[in-house]
């Protein structure tokens, strides 16, 4: 059964978008899905379950369903005007519209464990789960903290990531994408990009302003070759550009709690060289790390310049430190660096 696709005339009548933005042009969506080549991962899309968070006007939802005909497609949308719009447009369709809040953690335990409305298949972590996909639109202001929480869930293998390596297609402001995808040494490098690099393989798939590409690593842009579209193809048209990223969890082999402590404290002072910043990990830290780090060039680096492997190396040394502090007694705000420029 084909699902009707809302048009620009339909969505332009809506008054409230709650600060979020949505691509409306089906032609661009088709280019995006061709680029993603999702059937490589989901060889049997008829067995796929899709959880759509903040679907808004549902254009992407309808196009996705018509293209892949998944076994189950559930939309979590609590915002009043958008929920009413979805119900009116998709009444009687195979799309499952649920008035639930994607921001509320209890939504998922209720949906999956208690009511069993949406129950994904648990798969081993040696591959991307080929029967469960998550898509989300967090293009509103202040979404960065939520993305950080989701990234942390990948590291802790909880929330939706207890079902294995679950791919996520994520719309966000282009400024957030730039910070998320920043490489070592870039001005926008932050704890957000450090976490992303440690736990995921994330690619820029599409963006609504070519000028925004200047803020990304040029080699990465050449590799990703993102689809470009115009502000006229998103609604509402005013405001910041938006971007789509593809996020795949990856393997990692380090102690997450100790790694989080080390990266969090160092990134707060991200432009201070290691040869003077290590006391931030605990009293006596500078003397200890100076004696243990054999590569003296590493000591000249600032946290903003460190690679994922270098953070893991420092975490290993931290765990071997006889006088390391009790990380469970740490009360530093994990998002402090995300608002520190």
Curated annotation (Swiss-Prot):
Miscellaneous section: Present with 9380 molecules/cell in log phase SD medium.
GO terms under cellular component: mitochondrial DNA-directed RNA polymerase complex; mitochondrial intermembrane space; mitochondrial matrix; mitochondrion
The enzyme's E.C. designation: 2.1.1.-
Localization in the cell: Mitochondrion intermembrane space
Molecular function terms from GO: DNA binding; methyltransferase activity; mitochondrial transcription factor activity; RNA binding
Protein name: Mitochondrial transcription factor 1
Residues spanning the signal sequence: none
Family per record: Belongs to the class I-like SAM-binding methyltransferase superfamily. rRNA adenine N(6)-methyltransferase family.
Chain's role: Mitochondrial transcription factor that confers selective promoter recognition on the core subunit of the yeast mitochondrial RNA polymerase. Interacts with DNA in a non-specific manner.
Positions of S-adenosyl-L-methionine binding: 23, 77, 101, 137
Keywords (A to Z) from UniProt: DNA-binding, Methyltransferase, Mitochondrion, RNA-binding, S-adenosyl-L-methionine, Transcription, Transcription regulation, Transferase
Primary site of residence: mitochondrion
Pfam families the record matches: RrnaAD (PF00398)
GO terms of biological process kind: methylation; mitochondrial transcription; positive regulation of DNA-templated transcription, elongation; transcription initiation at mitochondrial promoter
Coiled coil in keyword set: no
InterPro entries: KsgA/Erm, Mtf1, rRNA_Ade_diMease-like_C, SAM-dependent_MTases_sf
